[in-house]
Amino acid sequence: LTFWRWVTAVIVLIPFVWKDVRDNLDLVRRHWKIYLAQGTFMVGGGTLLFTSLNFTTAINASLVNTTQPAVTALLTWIILKDRLKNIQYVGIASAIVGVVFMIAKADLAVLINLELNIGDFIVIFAILSYSMYAINLRKLPPGLGTFPTLFVILFFGTFPLLPFYIGETILVGPVPFL
């Protein structure tokens, strides 16, 4: 289903972006690797988040997902060596403390007896994927508008999903649309 979700998004965008993308095909060809990486991070994050819901609760996934801005800021600091402002450190700390407080329901015993499952870890990988997408946005070349760039990223993002879609279709059967 994820594969078709992204293919549908690509198809819907075509009439609005085709001329701009066609006029900038040389730019897209020269920078295909960053578009593929961005597509993989964007589509991967969404796919992992939805996959996690097969194993964990929506509440757990939502709580862990609230750390997204903090993780993005931390990765920007670690990978890109960007300096963070004091207010960002405060924001990161408060996000982490807030999530821990909510998960624990203000009860230390809950944290001590916390049982994580595979779905919780998949959410973490989804967050990491989204964060990598966010911090690599600055690597995108100038020249395409917002929607043409989104189109190209989504277009390239469907390719990493294709083997999984084919495998699922062979092993489980085609995805019902209705």
Summary of predicted features, one role per range:
Residues T2-F3, D26-W32, A104-S129, I166-L178:
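Juxtamembrane helix-entry segments on the extracytoplasmic side of multipass membrane proteins
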Residues L1, I87, T146-L150:
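Juxtamembrane helix-start motifs in multi-pass secondary transporters
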Residues T8, F41-M42, L48, V64, ...:
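Hydrophobic residues within membrane-embedded alpha-helical segments of Major Facilitator Superfamily
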Residues L1-I11, M42, F50-R83:
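Specific alpha-helical transmembrane segments that line the substrate/conduction pathway
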